[in-house]
């Protein structure tokens, strides 16, 4: 008789619009309780969000989830029982791109007041994002603009929730095939694209 080895599964879950009340703000406590029960059953529950990795890590600590969080749309991973940061993005590139579009657009372009970021810039939704991306590409900036539905995010090219999740899975030493992703916005699509189940 062969025993099947049970592997830990990973549930990668977004915050805003996915586990919040009315899409924004307060955490839906029933959703958090379900996530905790998945973790208590021996699986990993990893927050993957556009918010800061520190906010997500604190939610994982207080919520009883896996002590690892991917924040800033894949730009930073915060993990451990004491905070450890792994920076994947380059905030300097994002700041230079922000300054450039601010100086080349007629619209008022300004940073959104959010929890401080280590690898990205978060902007108010006040300008034409496809036009700005085209201009940045033409000028050779190494960034992508994303619309989360709440804010615009300036991230290093190649950095997104998918690449951040792949780095998190390496840290956890688990297989991609054992991962499920949940989310609700354009910024979650790269995460859906790297997993088989979303």
Enumerate the predicted regions with their spans:
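Non-catalytic pre-domain segments flanking phosphatase-related domains
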Residues: 1-13, 30
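The start of beta-strands in P-loop NTPase/AAA+ ATPase cores
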Residues: 9-11, 67, 179
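Glycine-rich beta-strand-to-loop/alpha-helix junction loops that act as flexible
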Residues: 15, 73, 182-184, 197
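Hydrophobic "anchor" residues
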Residues: 18-19
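Active-site phosphate-binding/coordination module
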Residues: 26-114
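Receiver (REC) domain switch/active-site residues of two-component response regulators
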Residues: 67, 196-197
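Conserved acidic, metal-coordinating active-site core of Asp-based
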Residues: 100-195
